[in-house]
């Protein structure tokens, strides 16, 4: 884990996260001071002396499909934070002026069809509607059978994508936290008792047919 993950925007910085060619057990961070062996607290805490809007991190990506060459993820603060307009300004500048191959918009599954979500999708369609776009629908582990419908929620997003005129979009239903726990278990990465209990719950959830997210992905990837 190299960055904070919260429902609310938690930093006013652009994080550039680079993959390393091999695993050496070290994670480097450039946040005002270059640290070639940054520990967890260093990674989770922004340096108050950094007057720029950027933080760079270099680490090995534990990709289940293996490494495929150099990769940089640019993580933005978010745009829907009414508590800090700076976050929205930094993010919009990155979206409008940034040079990237693909834009990933993380959709909170619990906030689908809200006014904020629709307004931002409209903004993306107007500014980047022709570019490759991934809508990662996160937190689907929070859906409850009989109350929520994954298929209907995803179809609602596809309907917005079509109506707003996105030309090159895909929708990827995910549970980032379930994936995080699963990878910690696979790599024997010091899971605590609470995390093991949570992983057991996630496993039970995603064994159910209605939570089979693989059903929404193509069987073959070009």
Label every PLM stretch briefly.
Residues 1-219:
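Globular "head" domains of long coiled-coil molecular machines
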């Amino acid at each position: 884990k190299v960055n904070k993950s919260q429902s609310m925007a938690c930093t006013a910085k652009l994080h550039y996260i680079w993959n390393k060619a091999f695993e050496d057990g070290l994670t480097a961070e450039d946040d005002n001071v270059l640290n070639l062996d940054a520990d967890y607290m260093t990674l989770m805490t922004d340096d108050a002396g950094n007057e720029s809007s950027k933080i760079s991190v270099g680490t090995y990506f534990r990709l289940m499909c293996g490494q495929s060459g150099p990769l940089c993820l640019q993580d933005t603060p978010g745009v829907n934070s009414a508590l800090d307009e700076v976050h929205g300004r930094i993010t919009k500048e990155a979206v409008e002026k940034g040079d990237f191959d693909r834009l990933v918009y993380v959709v909170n599954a619990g906030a689908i069809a809200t006014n904020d979500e629709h307004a931002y999708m409209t903004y993306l369609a107007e500014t980047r509607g022709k570019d490759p776009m991934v809508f990662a629908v996160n937190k689907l582990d929070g859906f409850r059978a009989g109350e929520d419908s994954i298929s209907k929620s995803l179809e609602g997003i596809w309907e917005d994508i079509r109506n707003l005129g996105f030309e090159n979009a895909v929708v990827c239903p995910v549970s980032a936290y379930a994936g995080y726990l699963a990878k910690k278990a696979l790599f024997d990465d010091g899971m605590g008792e609470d995390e093991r209990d949570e992983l057991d719950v996630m496993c039970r959830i995603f064994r159910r047919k209605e939570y089979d997210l693989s059903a929404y992905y193509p069987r073959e990837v070009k």
